[in-house]
Swiss-Prot record:
PROSITE patterns on file: AA_TRNA_LIGASE_II
Protein name, per record: Histidine--tRNA ligase
Record InterPro entries: aa-tRNA-synth_II (IPR006195), aa-tRNA-synth_II/BPL/LPL (IPR045864), Anticodon-bd (IPR004154), Anticodon-bd_dom_sf (IPR036621), His-tRNA-ligase (IPR015807), HisRS-like_core (IPR041715), HisRS/HisZ (IPR004516), HisRS_anticodon (IPR033656)
Quaternary assembly: Homodimer.
An annotated Gene Ontology molecular function: ATP binding
A GO CC term assigned to this protein in UniProt: cytoplasm
Residue ranges the record marks as coiled coil: none
Organism: Burkholderia cenocepacia (strain HI2424)
Cystine bridges: none
Length: 446
């Protein structure tokens, strides 16, 4: 009796941690290239920090009573040395940690940017994932409202570069520590009047982080939050001057904004300016970028008192908008797909493919899928599906004559009567292809 073959279980990815497949990678590359060009134009330098940090970095930096620290962090104990570690839920704290550890501010302020995956343990939904990607900037050592205005305007310039519309700016000021303390006393008094109707989340926050109650999404609490004491009414002269200075700079540069007194952000390190860029095209997850000023953070993490501001934006949400507005660019194919028939032709074709790559052309060489030679027809199908501009064809007869076939697959040269296979001497192949691509591009511009 033959033993029945055991079925091997198919493994799948972790829910909320998504693969970026080849058909989507082009859109990611387009966004990354656009944002990197913008960041270079503003003089920002790239910094790359580890995915895993000591848990204390986030409990001290973000705040122990924030949702991120209380409910959303992927934390674990290192079995080797007992250290408490966390997969980064955001990257501002890590960038600040690195700037302190490596004494990066000894010679003055720094403009830094980062890009990479973040991790939060929450229920996956559209625009909200357990592994998600952010790009962000941190302007360390800049105290004035001009730095706040500059990082906000960077976002507007990025929306313009990407072609996105309908993303609106909301701003607020959280003032200084003593102003928040005075507001906190009055806010708790106000909220205590409604203790019987507050939901569990609001009750939990009432005495630990009452400011976050104003950010509630519960429809039943909207009137309570709307009529609560506003932090902006508690601002002193210094905070008010900073906020008004920001508004003047935004207005002078034609950046429309809305002052939202309930905008508080979910991280404890913010002071003075906070802002969000929001859209109504993504449902409940309408914030695509957010940030503000976090002057106390560098000192909280062991550095010298240093002013700082920055923002982070969710890449997945921006890509959703690009798709929604049909702004995703067409994926570009390679320049050449090399087809061959016969053993001798295969060897010559392989050598030619490498020589073409030496000149800077993008080339796919047809490799056998199953070890057996593929038919000419199937290879040409593969060539067309690859998106290549030209097929270069090596047959035994062509090789014997020192020639090669070239057929246009894309562009003006592939249309109508122009689309005929041409025979070209092998030694002239590179020059022929480059001239053909230039001619095709010029025809396409006409």
């Amino acid at each position: 009796m033959t033993e029945q073959k055991r079925k091997i279980e198919k493994l799948t990815g972790v829910k909320g941690m998504n693969d970026i497949l080849p058909q989507d990678a082009g859109l990611w590359e387009f966004f990354e290239a656009t944002v990197k060009s913008l960041l270079r134009a503003y003089g920002y330098q790239n910094i790359r920090t580890p995915i895993v940090e000591h848990t204390q970095l986030f409990t001290r930096g973000i705040g122990e009573v924030t949702d991120i620290v209380e409910k959303e962090m992927y934390s674990f104990t290192d079995a080797l040395n007992g250290e408490n570690l966390t997969m980064r839920p955001e990257n501002t704290a890590a960038v600040v940690r690195a700037s302190i550890e490596h004494n990066m501010l000894y010679d003055g302020p720094k403009r830094l940017w980062y890009i990479g995956p973040m991790f939060r343990h929450e229920r996956p939904q559209r625009g909200r994932y357990r592994q998600f990607h952010q790009v962000g900037v941190e302007a360390l050592g800049f105290a004035g409202p001009d730095a706040d205005a500059e990082i906000i305007m960077m976002c507007q310039r990025l929306w313009d570069d990407l072609g996105l519309t309908g993303i609106k700016l909301e701003i607020n000021s959280l003032g200084l520590a003593e102003e928040r303390a005075a507001h906190r006393v009055e806010l708790i008094k106000y909220l205590e009047q409604f203790a019987d109707v507050l939901d569990e989340d609001a009750k939990r926050r009432l005495y630990t982080n009452p400011l976050r109650v104003l950010d509630t999404k519960n429809p039943a609490l909207q009137d309570i939050a709307q009529n609560a004491p506003k932090l902006i009414d508690f601002l002193g002269d210094e905070s008010r001057a900073h906020f008004e200075g920001l508004q003047r700079l935004l207005l002078a540069n034609n950046i429309p904004f809305k002052i939202n007194p309930r905008l508080v952000r979910g991280l404890d390190y913010y002071n003075l300016t906070v802002f969000e860029w929001v859209t109504d095209k993504l449902g409940a997850q309408g914030t695509v970028a957010a940030g503000g000023r976090y002057d106390p953070l560098i000192e909280q993490l062991g550095g010298k008192p240093t002013a700082a501001c920055g923002w982070a934006m969710g890449i997945e949400r921006i890509l959703e908008l690009l798709k929604e507005e049909d702004l995703a660019p067409e994926q570009e194919g390679v320049d050449v797909y090399v087809v061959h028939q016969g053993d001798t032709a295969r060897e010559q074709a392989f050598i030619a493919a490498e020589r073409l790559r030496d000149t800077g052309l993008d080339v796919i060489f047809h490799c056998s899928a199953d070890g057996a030679p593929a038919s000419f027809k199937s290879q040409m199908k593969r060539a067309d599906a690859s998106g290549a501009a030209f097929a270069v064809i090596f047959g035994e007869e062509e090789v014997a004559n020192g020639t090669v076939g070239v057929k246009a697959l894309r562009g003006a040269g592939a249309e109508g009567e122009k689309n005929v296979q041409q025979t070209v001497p092998v030694e002239s192949l590179t020059e022929f292809l480059i001239n053909a691509m230039v001619a095709s591009a010029e025809d396409g511009d006409d």
